[in-house]
Design a protein with these regions (language model features):
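N-terminal glycine-rich "phosphate-gripper" loop used for MgATP/nucleotide binding
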Residues: 70-78, 95-100
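A charged, well-structured terminal subsegment
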Residues: 126-141
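ADP-ribose/adenylate-binding Rossmann-like module
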Residues: 85-109
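Short acidic, glycine/proline-enriched helix-loop-strand junctions
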Residues: 50, 63-65, 101-126
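Hydrophobic, well-ordered beta-alpha structural blocks that scaffold small-molecule cofactor pockets
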Residues: 1-51
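A short helix->loop->beta-strand "cap" motif at the edges of active sites that frequently abuts
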Residues: 36-38, 88-92, 112-115
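Mobile, glycine- and charge-enriched loop segments
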Residues: 46-74
Length: 141
């Protein structure tokens, strides 16, 4: 699998699995994408989530379906999300980390023709600890 890069996201990204459990992270993530010219379409795991910015309750609420998605859910939900995204024409998916994905899920994506990456986009866009994490992980910014 190739390393995550800014180009992977293109101009827009659908974020699946964001919740109000870690509100600060999602606010920073949203800001980081927007600051880099990437339009964000967040879909919380619970529609009642109040993240402090616009979210979408379902795929039908989205004004467009981005070709790229970023998944922040547990493995138990990821496979179902991939089925939905594949049916909507999403062809690139980045996963937050190992809690979201395993080899079986990656093979499923491959069989569906979905390009995948693993890693937190904050390593690409943020500073401070995220910048240090990017250096350790070998992520080129």
């Amino acid at each position: 699998m190739e390393k995550l890069s800014k180009d992977f996201f293109g101009n827009e990204v659908l974020i699946c699995g964001c919740s109000d459990k870690d509100n600060l992270y999602y606010k920073r993530l949203n800001k980081a994408f927007l600051s880099n010219g990437i339009t964000v379409y967040p879909m919380p795991t619970t529609p009642e989530s109040e993240l402090g910015f616009k979210t979408y309750k379902s795929y039908t609420d989205l004004p467009i379906i981005p070709k790229c998605a970023y998944i922040l859910s547990y493995k138990s939900k990821t496979s179902e999300i991939i089925d939905e995204l594949s049916g909507l024409g999403v062809n690139k998916i980045a996963f937050y980390g190992n809690a979201c994905v395993d080899d079986e899920i990656l093979h499923k994506c491959d069989s569906l023709g979905i390009e995948t990456r693993l890693g937190c986009p904050m390593m690409l866009f943020a500073s401070g600890f995220c910048w240090i994490h990017a250096k350790i992980a070998g992520v080129k910014r």
